[in-house]
From Swiss-Prot:
Protein name stated in the entry: Phosphoglycolate phosphatase
Cofactors (names): Mg(2+)
GO CC terms of this entry: cytosol
Record's keyword terms, sorted: Carbohydrate metabolism, Hydrolase, Magnesium, Metal-binding
Protein function: Catalyzes the dephosphorylation of 2-phosphoglycolate.
GO MF terms, alphabetically ordered: magnesium ion binding; phosphoglycolate phosphatase activity
Residues where Mg(2+) binds: 9, 11, 173, 177
Keyword Isomerase assigned: no
Source organism of the structure: Methanosarcina mazei (strain ATCC BAA-159 / DSM 3647 / Goe1 / Go1 / JCM 11833 / OCM 88) (Methanosarcina frisia)
Residues that hold substrate according to the record: 150
Catalytic activity reported: 2-phosphoglycolate + H2O = glycolate + phosphate
Active site: 9
Cited PANTHER family: HAD SUPERFAMILY HYDROLASE-LIKE, TYPE 3 (PTHR10000:SF8), PHOSPHOSERINE PHOSPHATASE (PTHR10000)
Protein family: Belongs to the archaeal SPP-like hydrolase family.
Amino acid sequence: MKFKALVIDIDGTITCKNRELHLGAVKKMRTLNVPVVLATGNILCYARTASRLIGLGGAVIAENGGAVTVRYDVNGIFEGSLEECEKAFSFLSQHFKLTKLDPTYRKTEIALRRDFDLEEARSLLETQPFDIELVDTKYAIHIKSIKINKGIGLQKLAGMMGFEAEDFVAIGDSANDAEMFEAAGFGIAVANGDERVKEVANYVTEASFGDGAVEAIEFLESNGWI
């Protein structure tokens, strides 16, 4: 079993508990001889900047799969629109005081501060005809289309890179990484990961956060899989 590329989440996976980049994970990624793609719920310009500063090739999945690009100098491709998300936001705003995060730069979803009752909001949304879901990444709550996720983003980006999604190993920690694990050929959850992502993972590390990412990569190398 040999994989051709790696796709890895940022926050909670290649960071420390305080959200600083884990230098050991950064160094480990830079030693690999396969393409490394960053996948995040954050905005495209953030993902691109992180890729560049880490020293990777610029291929990223952003906005939970809603935005992808293969290089720094190639325009991002966006899937879906904000129209349905805005309708859901307007509806929920009648019940909660909501604060948008990075609204100027988000093109395919709405990210909210985590200061309202998520389960109550989900129950309220079920009464409406929106094809929308609320996803908690532990750093923000995202109003997003049910037709967009990191797995779909990986399939799109893999094709743009000349690969299949199954050619990738995926590493992550949050519930929004689950579809990416299912699309990839192999999924590794770090120890601090959500139960949802651990359930679909092929391997769960003993270490957490960036230490877990290092452990994951070393596990793959020791088996000759990358």
